[in-house]
């Protein structure tokens, strides 16, 4: 049985050498953070065309979620793939009632939302970019599909980009709660319509942390999550929200953003 993964760096691991035509892999390490960048340049491969950036760091349950080195590492990679101007809609994807799936909503809750402050002539003096945040919930509890809700919001708000934050699946136990993936290819939530430029009509960037892993027990497939998942989600959501806020509001320091969203 093939073990599923959302992490592109696990599909095209740099240590294996050869990759298919149309795939480029780059690796780097700085300040104890490993980076694997996978560029998929054509369709028909194991992942959609786009850039996938994986940052490997210590387990979220053990780190300071306001550590500026980690915040900067994620923020700088986000800035490299997000448009430089215009409204960004942060969408917290997932079910907040299920701990391992609550990363998206928890991150959106901590977002520094500014759209309501950036509509007057004084907006230039505020040094702020317009940002909105939304956690659509899950269809089983709302009766509304995430794609439907985001399509409506995107049509109304016309954002420069939608940033979707979600929990991911990994095939590597060492990456559970210890990696971040950023993708320009959008997001396909579990058994739900894809959230992409084609479906939402604007650029879609996905941001996530692997919180679950499939295992084949022989008799049946299992999905497992770390025993410290509560701490992982709490600190990962805090760090990711700071990184998103820093990427979108570079004029503010990490300390200022932490104060403004506390």
For each feature predicted by the language model, list its residue ranges.
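C-terminal functional extensions of proteins
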Residues: 200-262
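Glycine-rich phosphate/diphosphate-binding loop of Rossmann-like nucleotide-binding domains
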Residues: 95-129, 133
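Glycine-rich phosphate-binding loop
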Residues: 147-194
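Gly/Ser/Thr-rich loops at beta-strand to alpha-helix junctions
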Residues: 93-101, 140, 167-171
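N-terminal amphipathic/basic leader segments beginning at the initiator methionine
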Residues: 1-50
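An N-terminal, well-structured beta->alpha segment
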Residues: 41-81
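A structural-propensity feature for long, helix-poor, extended segments
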Residues: 126-154, 158
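Short glycine-rich or small-residue beta-strand-to-loop segments that form or flank ligand, phosphate
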Residues: 56-58, 87-98, 133-137
